[in-house]
Structures are given as C-alpha cells and as structure tokens.
C-alpha cells in the first residue's frame, strides 16, 4: 500500500488571508507572498477573478510552507482562541455553505507529525508518542476507507440515529414531539474533506507546534502501523481522561459494539471494575477517587499530555460544577433551544460502562424530555462542554419542588472510549512499551504494518 494523502479542513470564513512562504504554483503560474481570497456570489474572488475552486501546490515539496491567518482553535471549548498557523503541503480553497473552506492536502505521515505535537506536548515520552502515532494513524485510515458523510448520512436516519448538525431535520422535530432527543456527533459532518483540524476529529495545527526529534522518531519507528481487529483497521478513539474506567463505543455513538473498545478498569487490576451502569455503583465510583493510571496530579506527567491551554484545566479526574436555578434554566434554553421553564430535576436514565450518562431526563415546569447521547448532554449543560457526562446530581434548597441550586460532581474529561491520554502518559513513565499501552486500551487488537 502506498502512503495516502489526507485532506484537512482548517478554516471556514467569508474571507481567508494567507501567506505563501515558498513558491507555489496554480493554473501553471508561480505565486508566493501575501494572498487574500473572498467569498462572492457563490464563488471565490482572487486577484480580480472568480473561481469555483483554487489549488495552490508547492513547487518544491521538501521546502514548502504557507501560513493561514486567524485560525480558530478549540471551537466551542473553554480554550477557544485565534492564532496564525503554518502548514506544509498543498492548500485547497472551496466554497461551502456561503463561506470559504481552507483545506490542507498533505501526506499522512506528515499530518501525523503535526497531530502528535498538537494533541500532546512534544516533550512526552517516546513510548507514549509511539502509541499515539499508531492510534492517530488507525483512526485516520479507518475513516479514509469510508466515503464522505453525504453518502453515509442516508443510513443514519432512524429514530435512534440522528446525524450531526441536523437541527432543522424533520426527524429531530418528530423526536422532540416524542419527548426524546438522542443525537451523537461524528466526523460525518464533513462533506468535502476527510477530517477537520480541531477536537471534533484530531487536533491539527500544521507546523505551528514545533515537532521535536522525539516526535519524528515516534512517527518513523511506527511508520504505517495500525491497530487491527478481525481484519479491519480499528476505529481507535481516544480522550483526555477516562476517569478510571473505559467507556464502550455504542454508548457514545452508533449502536454498534466494537469488541476492542470494551469496558475495563484503567489500572493494573484491569478486571476489577464495578458495574457502573447501575446508579448506586456509579454514584459510589464518582464520589470517590479510585486508583487508576489516569488518577495523577504529577505535573511532569500532565505536561506531557496537556498543552498550555489544556493545563488551564486543573481538575479532570474528579470535578465539580454548580448552577443556580436561574442560571441553569437560561443555559439549557440557550444551548438546546427548548424552554423547559424552571428546572425541577435532572434524572439519570441510562449510564454506560464508565458511569457516563447516555440518557438524561430533564424535568422542567413547562416540559420534560430525555436527551442523549453523552456529547449532547455535555453541550446542553455547559456554556461550552462539561468535562464528561459521568456525573451525579445533587439538588440544594428545594422549595415547593424547585431547587435553588444544582451541583454536578463528575469524573473524567472526554468520552472515555479507547486510549486515555493521561493514563497512557503514566504508563509510559512507569516503563510500559507502546505496544503494551495500546493493547491495554484496545482489548484483543493487533498491531499490523500497512506500508
């Protein structure tokens, strides 16, 4: 198999400013320097001419570079901000949803060098970096083997399968009438490129985050290696902190069980895990701080996984959020577009194997509804995202059935499926090799070399 290329959606704006730092060619002409492209009447306006698509290809691939200005990172997360970013490879610009989309076309291994440096600190241990290289490559190539989402969405329209970004869908309206809103979010949102550059897919910030010799060594040592299960590349999901227990795929996304993404405790005693689908066990688990690889406050280890903006978060293994009644009711209205009135209760309906809520009943004075899955719950109950949906609810000062305040006590950061980045960092520090780390988180998988 030849090393493939990947198309990464970077920027989505009415106008894109960029600098070609080395010579590029387009339509047989050589160009460089500062450029501005603007959306105009369904087309791309560049240098006084109108285009349907632009493709700037490097004249010399080994020394190519361009810079995109005002790229938003951390979209809808608490660390959202803009920065200028540099990339290698080609730059494609297309029209999408009355805006312009800037797409980086790049070889997979070059893409991975950036992902590892963007997702994690470049000072991480070699074994951790090698493990992350394999899962990032696996996740990417598993997705590249599928058609773009426009074709896949057709098979996702059942009452339990609401595709990403369908707020005006007739199906969604039907679900609302039935007082159930179940939605999950996938890379299926991307129609004209393979992956985006933010946390919805994998963090990709080009060569903005300087890669080290260690990162390049990790990519080279694992070149072409992927996780496999039953002859198929694994959909190798990962999150920041599982909270001590692995979640299973079907509780977060489509109702399909992947055997390599199974429940397990994130510790040496991997089989010693309570049944966290049960409310009493989940509450006991979340209110305490069980031993786990990811239960650490070691700043040296955390700095390997958390970039500067991630380190703005200090509590992730166990955390707490409090809302006043008025604050919560307004927040839910703003985030969901549904007026529940005053919030009387938040009731767990279903939990996954890590204790994460899959379905949550919101009881209000005007409306009651069950929502899910985990990311929909996290988005509804936070101005950006709750750290996870593994939380329990305490009501404070209840008068005439109406609480003055809600306290959410939670566990972990992210969906908890697959590799736990903080847990893997601890394993690397404790001397575990990358293959041992991978097979701890992807149960029964194998590591195969594709190219």
Question: What is the role of each PLM region?
Answer:
Residues 1-451:
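Conserved, single-site charged/polar hotspot
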